[in-house]
Design a protein with these regions (language model features):
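Substrate-binding clefts and catalytic carboxylate motifs of secreted carbohydrate-active enzymes
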Residues: 1-105
Length: 105
C-alpha cells in the first residue's frame, strides 16, 4: 500500500473549512504538479521492487473521503488531482519490467 498524496481543493471537499485535513502541498504554488511528481517518485521505487518479485501494489486512496484529502479525485469526483497522462505513463512502465524468476524448489 502506498500513496496519501493529499491536498485540499476548495468547493470539492466534504467540508470546505479544511480544518482537520492534512494538505501536504499547501505551500506549493502548483499542488497538482507537486503531487504528480511525488506519485512518479513512488512509482520509480516500485519498479525496483517489481524486479525483485513484487506482484501487486495498492494506492491509497482513489478518492477524497470525509476528512481526508488523499485521493486521486476530489470528494465530489469532479476533479482529477494528479496529471492523468503522467500517472498513466508511470503505471504503464510496470508492464515493461521483467519479473523476478520464481523461487526454485
Amino acid at each position: 500500500e502506498y500513496g496519501a498524496l493529499g491536498y485540499f481543493v476548495p468547493r470539492h471537499s466534504w467540508s470546505d473549512n479544511g480544518k482537520y485535513m492534512h494538505d501536504y502541498y499547501k505551500d506549493q504554488p502548483d499542488k497538482k504538479l507537486a503531487a504528480t511528481n511525488e506519485y512518479v517518485e513512488f512509482m520509480d521505487k516500485i519498479y525496483g521492487y517489481i524486479a525483485k518479485g513484487l506482484s501487486a501494489t495498492v494506492y491509497t486512496q482513489w478518492t477524497d473521503v470525509e476528512n481526508e484529502v488523499n485521493g486521486l479525485y476530489t470528494y465530489d469526483r469532479k476533479i482529477i488531482k494528479l496529471d492523468k497522462e503522467r500517472v498513466k505513463s508511470a503505471n504503464m512502465k510496470c508492464y515493461q519490467i521483467p519479473l523476478a524468476p520464481a523461487p526454485s524448489k
